[in-house]
Amino acid sequence: MKIERFVNASRKTLVEAQVLCQDANSRISNARSSFSHWERSISKIRFLLNCLKNQGSFIKNCILKVGIEENLIEKEWTQSILVDLAKELKYWNSKINEQVRVLDSIENILDEDTKSESKNLGYFVSRDNLDILEKRLKEIPNVKYHIDNIRGQYNTMFKKVSNYLINKRLKSVQEYFLTNFENDSDDIKKLTTTLPSKLVSLEHDLADYLSSITNHYDQSKLLQTLKPADPDYTDLLEVVKNDNSELDGIVTLLRETVDEVDETLKTFLGIFNEIELKQKECNKLLFGVIEEFKINHEYLLIFNDISSLIDNFKETCIEDINNTRSLCIFYQKFEIGYQNLLFEIERRKTVAQKMTDIIKNCELELSKINEEDQKNRSEFLKLNGDYLPENIWPGKIDDFSPLYSLEYSIKEI
């Protein structure tokens, strides 16, 4: 009967100890889970801050400084368009107009009508697009005005990104994060090291107490199965008696340890709640900076749109320059062709004169031969005409018409 009391008392104590330890461990686990979730959130914030830092540096140095200021505004727009392209426009505008003036100054000697509009070579060339480059040159000041405005917007944006967004807004969030969430913070040390270590120690104490109570219960159950005559009965009974006398003290220590766990958790959760509020504030500040980055991204799209307009202007100018260059080459070849035409006319005149001289010489030689032929015919008739009947060679014997006929025409050049 006495042994059964030991068993019942140890069972009751074990159940109570298990409930106390389980509840305490559950509260510790919940606190750890909340803190683990918080640590992941902090890691995410740390990651986002590093991303924003890198993105800010990329926007400032690569996109704004190098991409927009150096490559786009200074090289592509200012140098390439306002200087190089304007120089090309002026050169070819002067070139085409000078070429037309040259054609206007060359008299068309082939036109004998003094009142004709085609008295000079300029009459034969189109003047519809001669002023196209002049028009493009007149657009350059307007393009320069827009580029200057863009440069002003760029300077404003660069200062905003550098001085306000990076050096002020982002830096303030970084400093807030470092002050409140890095390991050298007192509260962070308590949450990551001091209090967790204490909770682990208390968990070990609870485990030891529960192990002692469980061991006492197991020994009580074993004693219940033994008989007084068994060899181990007396020694085990003495152990169970001694442990039973200490049972209340162990339970008291266990309860005190549970209370200490709760006090530690209270301190832990108090600090954690404060740090969680700071995390929410940090999130608020962080997402404010992210919104600023989005706004600046929209500003960058404006540069892209303006760049497209200026690129279209440049492409149009280059196309007009190429057309004007081709026109200049055509006009130069027209001038050369006209000079070659004059040479060709002289060559043809020379050929025509040679032909005329040859034909005149031919006529003279034929005339001489014909005179000789006429004499020979007369002599023939004197000697033979009276003896030959006419019908032996009808219409031919006494025919004194020339043996040749010569018809020709030479074009007047």
From Swiss-Prot:
Membrane-topology descriptor: Peripheral membrane protein
Alphabetized, the UniProt keywords read:
Autophagy, Coiled coil, Cytoplasm, Membrane
Molecular-function annotations in GO:
molecular adaptor activity; protein kinase activator activity; SNARE binding
GO:BP terms for this protein?
Answer: autophagy of mitochondrion; cellular response to nitrogen starvation; pexophagy; piecemeal microautophagy of the nucleus; positive regulation of autophagosome assembly; positive regulation of autophagosome size; protein localization to phagophore assembly site
Q: What is its main location?
A: cytoplasm
An annotated GO cellular component of this protein is: vacuole-isolation membrane contact site
| Role | Autophagy-specific protein that functions in response to autophagy-inducing signals as a scaffold to recruit other ATG proteins to organize pre-autophagosomal structure (PAS) formation. Modulates the timing and magnitude of the autophagy response, such as the size of the sequestering vesicles. Plays particularly a role in pexophagy and nucleophagy.
Q: Which PANTHER family match?
A: AUTOPHAGY-RELATED PROTEIN 17
Record protein name field? Autophagy-related protein 17
- What organism does the UniProt record list as the source? Vanderwaltozyma polyspora (strain ATCC 22028 / DSM 70294 / BCRC 21397 / CBS 2163 / NBRC 10782 / NRRL Y-8283 / UCD 57-17)
